[in-house]
């Protein structure tokens, strides 16, 4: 149903956000920004 779609979208968004935060953090640590 709709709830499972919403959950999937939220999961994907969370994954993307985590990926973005990780890459930002690692580039700051490596000073490659």
Swiss-Prot record:
Ranges in coiled-coil conformation: none
CC per GO annotation: extracellular region
Keyword Secreted applies: yes
GO BP terms: defense response to bacterium
UniProt KW keywords: Amphibian defense peptide, Antibiotic, Antimicrobial, Disulfide bond, Secreted
Subunit annotation: Monomer.
UniProt similarity note: Belongs to the frog skin active peptide (FSAP) family. Brevinin subfamily.
Main function: Has a non-hemolytic activity. Has a broad spectrum of activity against both Gram-positive and Gram-negative bacteria, fungi and protozoa.
Protein known as: Gaegurin-3
Taxonomic lineage from the root: Eukaryota, Metazoa, Chordata, Craniata, Vertebrata
Name of the gene: GGN3
């Amino acid at each position: 149903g709709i709830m499972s779609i919403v959950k999937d979208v939220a999961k994907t968004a969370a994954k993307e956000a985590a990926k973005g935060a990780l890459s930002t953090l690692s580039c700051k640590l490596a000073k490659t920004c």
